From Swiss-Prot:
Protein name, entry field: Anti-sigma F factor antagonist
Record organism: Geobacillus stearothermophilus
Phosphoserine sites (modified residues): S58
Pfam families named among the record's database cross-references: STAS
Record-linked PANTHER family: ANTI-SIGMA FACTOR ANTAGONIST TM_1081-RELATED, ANTI-SIGMA FACTOR ANTAGONIST TM_1081-RELATED-RELATED
Domain STAS: 3-113
Biological process terms in GO annotation: sporulation resulting in formation of a cellular spore
Domain of life from the UniProt record: Bacteria
Regions that span the bilayer: none
Keywords: Phosphoprotein, Sporulation
Family from the record: Belongs to the anti-sigma-factor antagonist family.
GO molecular function: anti-sigma factor antagonist activity; antisigma factor binding
Length: 116
């Protein structure tokens, strides 16, 4: 299966909606699209909506961690939302939830950033 990547910019927030599988086959494309958007726009925060993500492996974790570091370097925050149980388990095992905030849905994620 493939990965659909929807990027939406609201003010200085980048909303990334992923649908499908984020794995070693799709990670580089996802990383490049997000990185280019972050470099071209004055993005300060990222909301990562994983509601339609059906699978993620360690390559996907690497993409997320890389964008987290990129946004932290400009003083911003990343919030992840709508995480499925399988993906949540991977986040828990990796320890990413210790550094990245999680919210139930996109609206709550934007509110957590103070922009909704």
């Amino acid at each position: 299966m493939s990965l659909a990547i929807d990027l939406e910019v609201k003010q200085d927030e980048l909303i990334v909606r992923l649908s499908g599988e984020l794995d070693h086959h799709t990670a580089e494309n996802c990383m490049n699209k997000c990185r280019m958007c972050l470099e071209k726009r004055a993005i300060r925060h990222i909301v990562l909506n994983l509601g339609q993500l059906t699978f993620m492996d360690s390559s996907g974790l690497g993409v997320i961690l890389g964008r987290y570091k990129q946004i932290k370097n400009v003083g911003g925050q990343m919030v992840v939302c709508a995480v499925s149980p399988a993906v949540k388990r991977l986040f828990d095992m990796s320890g990413l939830f210790k550094i990245i905030r999680v919210e139930a849905d996109e609206q709550f994620a934007l509110q957590a950033l103070g922009v909704a």
